[in-house]
């Protein structure tokens, strides 16, 4: 089924409201295996809507119109659709009864002829009751094309779609998706590596999305059951993860989790809990962002003992007992400083892990290091590891955010190696 969504309303074209209905409908239709090919917005104008209906009827098998079902003069969606199909408007008894009750309970409200429009549907249509409003929707098939009219307010449209429309559109297959999350590899490199899979995809499909500091891959397939979908998605996932970077590194090393809501931080916090281990932090450029991120998760007190925010050289020396002369000799942005910060954070809190971040957030360089230079240290019983990352060409906020992601990834790898 090839679907098209037509949003009716001049206020959409003038930017007075955002057309969130199209996004909601596209998402829900995809979940039941209906592909949306076109989204269009048109003003409250009969001539232009008639023209658009003519185009839609030639290229789509499902045409959904949203908005324009109200009582005002510019609410003309049902009237225009009826004219296009050569049909009359008739009253839906249930909607008319609801309208009668509404005005009976509000004797001060004036009931005008325009109000009656809300209880009308195109002749032959299946009514779609409105749970939260007065304007009834409808579904009608003519010459192989299914037409649907829905109210514009999201509070009315959403329950009508979920409870009335989708059950009537259900087919034998649904769309199932799986999201893979990658860190440490850019979107362009990932897309290049997966070029053959992307170019030759039919079903299942994969689509990359770049986010701040990471990349996600959405794998989707149409299937009649979750079990059938899992089989197809498992095959595609393994094909993806078996690929290697140009340096010969498996993509499995970059894939850290699944799902829309998963994050590096959530993975690390849960793994620390599972292993019964604790962590402490000493932060300079990130000014407590790592610690605040850990504290966002419930039960963080079981794995997070505490930490230090040591922005200046003096505080690094005073709070972490690192000799000032050594800091001056090596610089606050250095492998040495990151190592000592991590080790002292671990030692002073008696934690299993000590993590440190020191670097240049910008906008100016520091100690000869360009903006985006970050040293991250991880101290544990086996020793201390320090990595240097370059997060160039980013805003100050992004440098700090991505630096924290690198820190969580370093901890994640250490936990996996235990």
Swiss-Prot record:
This is Putative competence-damage inducible protein. Disulfide bonds: none annotated. PANTHER family: NICOTINAMIDE-NUCLEOTIDE AMIDOHYDROLASE PNCC, NMN AMIDOHYDROLASE-LIKE PROTEIN YFAY. SUPFAM superfamilies: CinA-like, Molybdenum cofactor biosynthesis proteins. It holds the Pfam family CinA_KH. Gene3D superfamilies: 3.30.70.2860, CinA-like, MoaB/Mog-like domain. The gene is cinA. Belongs to the CinA family.
